[in-house]
């Protein structure tokens, strides 16, 4: 993106402030400033912004089988995240591949691999902020079409598909930001809900992803004030979806707490909005941390570590025992050239989850080697699995009766 284009973007934003609401003014200025500072990084992605994406309309008028969230979650086995893909934060359709080590566009052949590998849940993280095109928070139609196309890949495979808002830097749970955030949450989710209101119960909406005080000292621990504000955000999400018509009145929705944290104080602060029996708790838990997520941590799994059993005991105490289902929306262990230890950890994790009928969704970011967060399972280019032993473990637990889990 050249300097003239950057200048034009900022000038257009300033001129548009004349007719914007105060909340919209703040959001657009923040977005334009962020976009300008990352213009060089995003220039390649910008080139494809106006491409037309063909969209199947085969699921726009499905018959909804009305079921409780508890019964729906009981039908789930294991899940897989299409990570670092639609959640990347560049602009245009090219954003889909901007974070990937190999620029492989998502295709149906990838999603076709999931059922045979023991997965019947597909989570599609999507970032919407850089695809908003005006002061009314309108989402780029081409981006929405592409999201729908990928959703259809999952639905066509009989998968349960989780669709969310992901790396949204515009929500910040502070009193000064709350009203503007709620305005945008309602606007974004009204559009998503309208586009997908004809889909059946296999499509699940997840309102927020790891909402937190970004860049602040309490970013990952939270504050009581921020936790309360996030409850208000979730309430706005639920009310917006329920008011959108179609099948959305009976759709199961996922609710999270501060940062989607597995810390007890953050989980216990979750207040479910008034609704029917169609709400699911979402939590992220890469455990044990030093083994699973810390790039400088150990490559040895300690089966005596209590982090995994304590997580599920807490989830049972706070939610499962009260009839509220839970999905671990993100988990996994980084590749440290330690497949045997990773298999042992995965076995213990899935066994602990199965006791409480909690499906777990692996974070696959298509990264396998190097010093970063390497959670990749699927070789998207060659349509193979990098770690067959891990996949065999998923397949085993997909067939396991939760009541028999040890």
From Swiss-Prot:
It is an enzyme of class 3 (hydrolase). One of its GO terms (cellular component) is cell surface. One of its GO terms (molecular function) is beta-glucosidase activity. Its EC number is 3.2.1.4. Keywords: Carbohydrate metabolism, Cellulose degradation, Glycosidase, Hydrolase, Polysaccharide degradation, Signal. Residues 30-62 are annotated as: Disordered. Residues 1-43 form the signal peptide. The active site is at residues 210, 330. The keyword Hydrolase applies. It comes from the Bacteria. One of its GO terms (biological process) is cellulose catabolic process. Residues 30-41, 51-62 have a biased composition (Polar residues). SUPFAM superfamilies: (Trans)glycosidases. It catalyses: Endohydrolysis of (1->4)-beta-D-glucosidic linkages in cellulose, lichenin and cereal beta-D-glucans. Coiled coil: none annotated. Belongs to the glycosyl hydrolase 5 (cellulase A) family. PANTHER family: ENDOGLUCANASE, PUTATIVE (AFU_ORTHOLOGUE AFUA_5G01830)-RELATED, GLUCAN ENDO-1,6-BETA-GLUCOSIDASE B. This is Endoglucanase 1.
